[in-house]
């Protein structure tokens, strides 16, 4: 892919150009917190014509798309797939052939147990241009927000990411993948299992069978980086019962090794620590509130989306502007009225210098 038409901004990354963005973008949404998506990934989401998403993609990121963006839900979640992978591949190819800017939003990173390779293969075979935008994998980020480093001097020089799913064509027994567990037995470091909550007892049993000590620390983290995040700690012998008692839900990851006993969380993350806040308002207002709440240590999520709709008063405004010289003051009652007013001025090709004789009155700090 060429670089013609691409601009470089002050922070040193390439921004998307209208001339080159008509292709399919596989974008990693990160571990769950919408603030953890990459800057580049968010820019493409804001511009796309079609977005294909599933449960693992952050729903709050859908609020960033254009109003006319087409949304296609493909419904992947633990134990239930609304669309199977071959169907998703077909949708990607079909949408890519339309010549629009298409985003495939995937949880975590597309190439870390995200089946991104299968989707790329389908696009390659169909001759559809594409680009992969990496995401932050939950295998590292989720333990980190809970104070667990996957590597740490003196306890773990490596980490290993394993799928908790069982595939009959790979695993040799009902207990799990012998290749995976035999490999873990011969390695030092931290083991991170993704998508393994429903098979937690079998995974722990298999680890013991291949030589792991029953008192090896284990942490299970549910809904990491998202509202409702919970962590249960124990060891290989006790963790299954503790998780069952706590009724943890998917998505969840399992961390096994000495580092699972570490807790490097900050003692006080702010006055809103452990407080969940539901946001109501327009996308711009909710984003402003989200940033403020996050800075105080709280967790926020959108519960109601609101939008500003124009009324018949727009026509009355246009008539008034034709006689603007008869007015002395112009009053704005909110930030939204200012945005709409100057948007309409541009639509009507009215020179803002016609307002030079007016005095302005505004209500609220946001209108200043």
Kindly give the residue locations of the regions a language model identified.
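Class I S-adenosyl-L-methionine
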Residues: 2, 9-34, 39-136, 141, ...
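A contiguous loop/helix-start segment that scaffolds small-molecule binding in enzyme catalytic cores
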Residues: 2, 13-16, 22-24, 97-102, ...
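Signature of uroporphyrinogen-III synthase
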Residues: 32, 88, 226-251, 258-368
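Class I SAM-dependent methyltransferase SAM-binding "motif I" and its flanking Rossmann-like core
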Residues: 33, 107-187, 232
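Short, conserved loop/helix-junction motifs that constitute active-site signature segments
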Residues: 46-47, 64-66, 184, 208-215, ...
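Short gly/pro/ser/thr-enriched loop/turn and capping motifs at secondary-structure boundaries
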Residues: 59-60, 78-80, 137-141, 158-161, ...
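Beta-strand->loop->alpha-helix junctions that form or flank phosphate-binding loops
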Residues: 72-75, 134, 217-225, 301-304
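Short, conserved phosphate/pyrophosphate- and ester-handling motifs at nucleotide-, phospho-/glycolipid
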Residues: 135, 196, 364
